[in-house]
Amino acid sequence: MTIQTFKSTDFDVFTVDGLEERMSAIKTNIHPKLEALGEQFAEYLSKHTDENFFYHVAKHARRKVNPPNDTWVAFSTNKRGYKMLPHFQIGLWGTHAFIYFGLIYECPQKVETAHAFLEHLNDLKTNIPNDFVWSIDHTKPSVKLHKTLETEDLQKMIERLATVKKAELLVGIHISPEEFSAMTNEQFLAKIESTMQPLLPLYALCNR
């Protein structure tokens, strides 16, 4: 399958004014690429976890006034949804693309997962690549670079996942529009795989 990488014009959809207008641009320019990525990487994750993964392209159906500032495809083991489960994401903000694994506030497994992560805290600190980033709110683009974190910083983020009702924790990479301009399709797909690979052990900890 030939999958086109995201281009600089794809990031520009988030400058389109108006909910209907921006959603039209997203559906035309971004969703076909997310669908193709969904098919390919649902299969990849199923193969590497021995579980059946399904993909879910964000519909932004609850939005009535404000247009979305990001969009994505998510991967989970539930055919009906992903928010209630540990899941993977590939998506775009206006400033960058992202590839994540994580748990968001709807997930009821947060406490158990946080305890599992804390038991393997030193492994997480060592094995997560230095150029990966951590997010504590999927609705905001701000992140913390892994190599800048002390073990205590990571511990606090994980503990927050267990103790704060609305807490979230996601980890992965950001790719700038400039980086995409130098990437071939094959390099982009390889980048997704090389990002998911060190995140698979975190998924396994969620399901031990």
Swiss-Prot record:
Gene3D superfamilies: Protein of unknown function DUF1054. It comes from the Bacteria. Disulfide bonds: none annotated. Pfam families: DUF1054. Belongs to the UPF0637 family. HAMAP family: UPF0637 (MF_01851). This is UPF0637 protein BCG9842_B1177.
